[in-house]
UniProtKB/Swiss-Prot annotation:
Annotated binding of heme c, by residue: 70, 73-74, 137
Keywords of the record: Electron transport, Heme, Iron, Membrane, Metal-binding, Photosynthesis, Photosystem II, Signal, Thylakoid, Transport
GO cellular component: photosystem II; plasma membrane-derived thylakoid membrane
This protein's encoding gene: psbV
Gene3D superfamilies recorded: Cytochrome c-like domain
Signal sequence segment: 1-33
The record's free-text note on cofactor binding: Binds 1 heme c group covalently per subunit.
Protein name (database record): Photosystem II extrinsic protein V
Amino acid sequence: MVSVFSSLRQSFKGLLVLVPVLIGLAFISPAEAVQWDAETLTVPVNPDGAEVTFTDREINAGRKVFNTSCGTCHAGGITKTNQNVGLDPETLALATPARDNVDALVDYMKDPTSYDGEYSISDVHPSMRSAELYPAMRDLDDEDLRLMAGYILVSPKVQGSSWGGGKIYF
Protein backbone atom coordinates (compact mmCIF):
# COMPACT_ATOMS: atom_id res chain seq x y z
CA MET A 1 0.00 0.00 0.00
CA VAL A 2 2.82 2.39 0.88
CA SER A 3 4.60 1.65 -2.38
CA VAL A 4 1.45 2.48 -4.37
CA PHE A 5 1.21 5.93 -2.73
CA SER A 6 4.93 6.46 -3.16
CA SER A 7 4.64 5.63 -6.83
CA LEU A 8 1.67 7.99 -7.27
CA ARG A 9 3.53 10.77 -5.46
CA GLN A 10 6.52 10.38 -7.82
CA SER A 11 4.22 10.47 -10.84
CA PHE A 12 2.52 13.60 -9.50
CA LYS A 13 5.91 15.31 -9.00
CA GLY A 14 6.81 14.47 -12.59
CA LEU A 15 3.57 16.02 -13.80
CA LEU A 16 4.24 19.17 -11.80
CA VAL A 17 7.49 19.60 -13.69
CA LEU A 18 6.02 18.70 -17.09
CA VAL A 19 2.88 20.86 -17.01
CA PRO A 20 4.64 24.28 -16.92
CA VAL A 21 6.91 23.18 -19.77
CA LEU A 22 3.92 22.14 -21.89
CA ILE A 23 2.09 25.37 -21.11
CA GLY A 24 5.16 27.37 -22.15
CA LEU A 25 5.44 25.47 -25.43
CA ALA A 26 1.77 26.09 -26.18
CA PHE A 27 2.39 29.84 -26.37
CA ILE A 28 5.34 29.65 -28.75
CA SER A 29 4.08 29.72 -32.32
CA PRO A 30 6.25 28.61 -35.24
CA ALA A 31 6.30 32.19 -36.55
CA GLU A 32 7.88 33.43 -33.35
CA ALA A 33 10.37 30.59 -33.13
CA VAL A 34 11.68 30.78 -36.71
CA GLN A 35 14.14 33.31 -38.05
CA TRP A 36 13.85 33.46 -41.83
CA ASP A 37 16.85 34.02 -44.07
CA ALA A 38 17.23 36.96 -46.45
CA GLU A 39 16.35 34.83 -49.49
CA THR A 40 12.99 33.91 -47.98
CA LEU A 41 12.25 37.53 -47.09
CA THR A 42 13.22 38.92 -50.51
CA VAL A 43 10.40 39.49 -53.00
CA PRO A 44 9.89 41.47 -56.22
CA VAL A 45 8.99 45.09 -55.59
CA ASN A 46 7.94 45.90 -59.18
CA PRO A 47 7.65 44.23 -62.60
CA ASP A 48 11.10 45.51 -63.63
CA GLY A 49 12.83 42.98 -61.38
CA ALA A 50 13.81 45.22 -58.47
CA GLU A 51 13.60 43.42 -55.15
CA VAL A 52 13.00 44.32 -51.52
CA THR A 53 14.02 42.36 -48.45
CA PHE A 54 11.53 42.56 -45.60
CA THR A 55 12.45 41.97 -41.98
CA ASP A 56 10.87 39.32 -39.77
CA ARG A 57 9.17 42.12 -37.86
CA GLU A 58 7.69 43.61 -41.06
CA ILE A 59 6.33 40.24 -42.20
CA ASN A 60 4.76 39.62 -38.79
CA ALA A 61 3.23 43.12 -38.87
CA GLY A 62 1.94 42.43 -42.39
CA ARG A 63 0.46 39.13 -41.20
CA LYS A 64 -1.42 40.90 -38.41
CA VAL A 65 -2.81 43.58 -40.73
CA PHE A 66 -3.70 40.93 -43.34
CA ASN A 67 -5.48 38.72 -40.81
CA THR A 68 -7.45 41.68 -39.47
CA SER A 69 -8.33 43.26 -42.82
CA CYS A 70 -8.34 40.39 -45.32
CA GLY A 71 -8.20 37.13 -43.37
CA THR A 72 -11.95 36.61 -43.21
CA CYS A 73 -12.09 35.92 -46.95
CA HIS A 74 -8.44 35.08 -47.67
CA ALA A 75 -7.31 32.88 -44.75
CA GLY A 76 -4.45 30.67 -45.88
CA GLY A 77 -4.17 32.53 -49.18
CA ILE A 78 -7.44 31.25 -50.62
CA THR A 79 -10.40 33.30 -51.81
CA LYS A 80 -13.57 32.05 -50.14
CA THR A 81 -15.84 33.79 -52.64
CA ASN A 82 -14.00 32.38 -55.69
CA GLN A 83 -12.02 29.18 -55.17
CA ASN A 84 -10.43 29.55 -58.62
CA VAL A 85 -8.53 32.74 -57.74
CA GLY A 86 -6.23 32.49 -54.73
CA LEU A 87 -3.16 34.33 -53.52
CA ASP A 88 -0.67 31.67 -54.59
CA PRO A 89 2.29 32.80 -56.75
CA GLU A 90 1.04 31.23 -59.99
CA THR A 91 -2.40 32.84 -59.74
CA LEU A 92 -0.89 36.23 -58.91
CA ALA A 93 1.56 35.98 -61.84
CA LEU A 94 -1.14 35.03 -64.37
CA ALA A 95 -3.47 37.92 -63.49
CA THR A 96 -3.71 40.90 -65.84
CA PRO A 97 -1.84 42.93 -64.86
CA ALA A 98 0.39 40.51 -62.96
CA ARG A 99 0.04 40.94 -59.21
CA ASP A 100 3.19 39.07 -58.22
CA ASN A 101 5.11 42.04 -56.81
CA VAL A 102 4.68 44.54 -53.98
CA ASP A 103 3.72 47.53 -56.13
CA ALA A 104 1.07 45.57 -58.07
CA LEU A 105 -0.51 44.17 -54.90
CA VAL A 106 -0.60 47.61 -53.29
CA ASP A 107 -2.20 49.00 -56.45
CA TYR A 108 -4.77 46.19 -56.35
CA MET A 109 -5.59 46.84 -52.69
CA LYS A 110 -6.17 50.48 -53.55
CA ASP A 111 -8.40 49.81 -56.57
CA PRO A 112 -9.06 46.13 -57.35
CA THR A 113 -9.86 44.97 -60.86
CA SER A 114 -11.19 41.73 -62.28
CA TYR A 115 -8.67 38.94 -62.82
CA ASP A 116 -8.39 39.89 -66.50
CA GLY A 117 -7.97 43.57 -65.57
CA GLU A 118 -10.98 44.63 -67.63
CA TYR A 119 -13.07 46.37 -64.98
CA SER A 120 -13.02 47.65 -61.41
CA ILE A 121 -14.46 45.42 -58.69
CA SER A 122 -14.10 47.94 -55.87
CA ASP A 123 -17.86 47.85 -55.28
CA VAL A 124 -17.69 44.14 -54.31
CA HIS A 125 -14.09 43.71 -53.11
CA PRO A 126 -12.68 45.54 -50.06
CA SER A 127 -10.23 48.23 -51.09
CA MET A 128 -9.07 51.71 -50.21
CA ARG A 129 -11.42 53.02 -52.90
CA SER A 130 -14.41 51.43 -51.14
CA ALA A 131 -13.32 51.98 -47.54
CA GLU A 132 -16.73 53.41 -46.68
CA LEU A 133 -18.24 49.97 -47.42
CA TYR A 134 -15.48 47.94 -45.75
CA PRO A 135 -14.55 49.35 -42.32
CA ALA A 136 -11.48 47.11 -42.03
CA MET A 137 -9.85 49.17 -44.81
CA ARG A 138 -10.55 52.61 -43.35
CA ASP A 139 -7.52 52.99 -41.14
CA LEU A 140 -4.94 51.45 -43.47
CA ASP A 141 -2.19 53.54 -45.01
CA ASP A 142 0.34 52.83 -47.77
CA GLU A 143 2.77 51.28 -45.30
CA ASP A 144 0.09 48.83 -44.09
CA LEU A 145 -0.61 47.88 -47.71
CA ARG A 146 3.12 47.40 -48.39
CA LEU A 147 3.46 45.16 -45.33
CA MET A 148 0.44 43.08 -46.36
CA ALA A 149 1.86 42.71 -49.87
CA GLY A 150 5.16 41.52 -48.37
CA TYR A 151 3.33 38.99 -46.21
CA ILE A 152 1.32 37.69 -49.20
CA LEU A 153 4.49 37.25 -51.29
CA VAL A 154 6.61 35.69 -48.51
CA SER A 155 3.90 33.29 -47.30
CA PRO A 156 4.23 30.72 -50.12
CA LYS A 157 7.98 30.58 -49.51
CA VAL A 158 7.32 29.71 -45.86
CA GLN A 159 4.12 27.65 -46.12
CA GLY A 160 4.76 26.04 -49.49
CA SER A 161 1.84 24.84 -51.58
CA SER A 162 -0.53 25.04 -48.62
CA TRP A 163 -0.59 28.86 -49.10
CA GLY A 164 -3.40 29.42 -51.58
CA GLY A 165 -3.88 25.67 -51.97
CA GLY A 166 -7.35 25.59 -50.51
CA LYS A 167 -9.12 23.31 -48.10
CA ILE A 168 -7.16 20.17 -49.03
CA TYR A 169 -4.29 21.56 -46.94
CA PHE A 170 -6.30 22.42 -43.82
